[in-house]
């Protein structure tokens, strides 16, 4: 492993995924250094979640490679996955388990010391404000409570790379603020965050770099100020609209409004 590769946490090279006649991700190449929070944006169906699934070993690419901390996830899946923490867009929990039982299982899968795993789990659940529910099955949990358990599971083994797909989904404002500050702290410690979201205001504030995907291809890559200069937009929201919109937004809004009201002014 050369010096440059030691500084790169994520290396995607010509990553491609085809589903029958549809190319969901087309030759995506991307290098993310250690300690960076990289926002990965795109419209619905752009290929963001498919990219994350390939990068984390949950989906086999049609072609191309994903390397995590120097380990090709296709050739060395155990070594690569041991370094990854994932919060998926639609995370599935074993809801018949309690949070304590679920996190104990996650700790076992990562070969953590049982006492250490239990102590960390207890701390996470307490900090997330759900310690009083730690011994209740998760069948009746709200979306936000489940999300807190998923985030705890992703952090439990102290991963060097975090893949987060809409991580703030369902979280209350205070917890979302804590998580955003935590991500900055982890990045300052050298961890890498691959952050997928549609909440552009958060991405603009949190991410060091923004990559925009459309129709399975990278169409922009830079920090927020560079992307604003590129499009002469005032915000990341404006950048995103300029680069990915298929029509004039005001015309689209007007058409929706007329459809809702039947063309009648209120």
Positions of predicted regions on the chain:
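Conserved ABC transporter NBD signature motif
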Residues: 64-72, 80
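Conserved ABC ATPase "signature" region
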Residues: 104, 108, 115-133
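Catalytic Walker B motif of ABC-type/P-loop ATPase nucleotide-binding domains
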Residues: 162-166
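A short, surface-exposed alpha-helical micro-motif characterized by mixed small hydrophobic
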Residues: 203-204
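ABC ATPase "signature
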Residues: 221-222
């Amino acid at each position: 492993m050369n010096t440059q590769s030691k500084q790169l946490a994520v290396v995607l090279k010509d990553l491609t995924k085809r589903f029958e006649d549809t190319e969901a991700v087309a030759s995506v190449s991307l290098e993310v250094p250690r300690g960076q929070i990289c926002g990965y944006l795109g419209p619905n169906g752009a290929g963001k979640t498919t990219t994350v699934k390939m990068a984390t070993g949950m989906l086999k690419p049609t072609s191309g490679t994903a390397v995590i901390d120097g380990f090709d996830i296709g050739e060395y899946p155990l070594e690569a996955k041991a370094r990854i923490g994932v919060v998926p867009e639609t995370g599935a929990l074993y809801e018949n388990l309690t949070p304590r039982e679920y996190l104990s299982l996650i700790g076992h899968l990562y070969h953590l010391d049982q006492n250490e795993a239990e102590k960390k789990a207890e701390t996470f659940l307490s900090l997330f404000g759900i310690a009083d529910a730690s011994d209740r099955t998760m069948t009746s949990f709200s979306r936000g409570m489940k999300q807190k358990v998923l985030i705890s599971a992703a952090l439990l083994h102290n991963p060097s790379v975090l893949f987060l797909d809409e991580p703030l989904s369902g979280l209350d404002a205070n917890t979302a603020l804590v998580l955003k500050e935590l991500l900055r702290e982890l990045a300052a410690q050298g961890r890498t965050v691959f952050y997928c979201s549609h909440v552009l205001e958060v991405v603009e504030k949190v991410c060091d770099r923004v990559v925009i995907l459309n129709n399975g291809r990278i169409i922009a890559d830079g920090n927020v100020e560079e992307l604003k200069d590129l499009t002469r937009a005032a915000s990341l929201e404006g950048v995103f609209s300029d680069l990915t919109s298929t029509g004039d937004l005001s015309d689209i809004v007007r058409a929706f409004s007329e459809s809702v009201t039947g063309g009648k002014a209120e």
